[in-house]
Amino acid sequence: MGTRDWLTVSAAAIIMLSGSASAAQLDGVTLPDAVSLDGTELHLNGIALRTYSWLGIHIYVAGLYLEHPSHDAEAILDSPEKKLLAVRFVHNVDVANARQAWREGFEDNCRAPCHLAPSDVERFLAAMPSMRAGDHSTLAFTREGLKITMNGKTLATITDPMFSRAVLATFIGPKPPTPRLKRELLHNTK
C-alpha cells in the first residue's frame, strides 16, 4: 500500500471516528455515549456528580448505560435488559466510608419483600477497596447477575437478581445518596 492509500485510509478512519466518537463530560470526567456489554450496545442514559455534605465535596461521576434509555426508575430496576453503571472517582474514599455508604444504601433501598442474603452482602462489602481519585469502577447488570470491577479487575460476581436490583436501587431507588444524583442518572430535568 502506497503513501496515498495510507492517507486515504487514515482520512476515512478520522472521519468515521469523529462522526461516532461523542461523549458526555462532567467535572472533568468524560464518558462515552455508548459502551458494549457482552456484545450488546448500551447507551448513556444520564451522567451525574455525587457530592457529599453541605460543602458539596465532589466524590465521583457516574454514568448509567441502558439498552433503551428511560426516565422511569422502577421500569429500569424491573427490566431484565443489560445495564451498566460506570463510576469515575474524583476524590479519595477510604474503605470504611465506602462500606458504610453501601450498608446505608441497602438498608434504605431494600425494603420487604426485598431480602439480601447476608453472605452476598458480606462478599460484596469485603470486595470493596479504598478508592483513589482517578480510579474507575463498573457495575455490570445482566441476567446472570452483577459483576463489579475496579480499574479493569473483577472484584466480585453475585448471581442473585434481588441483589443486583438492590445495588442499582442505591443509585436510582427511593432513597439515593442525593436526589440530584438520581435525577441526573435518569436524565430527568424535573
Give, region by region, the residue ranges found by the protein language model.
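Mid-length scaffold segments of soluble, non-membrane domains
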Residues: 67-143
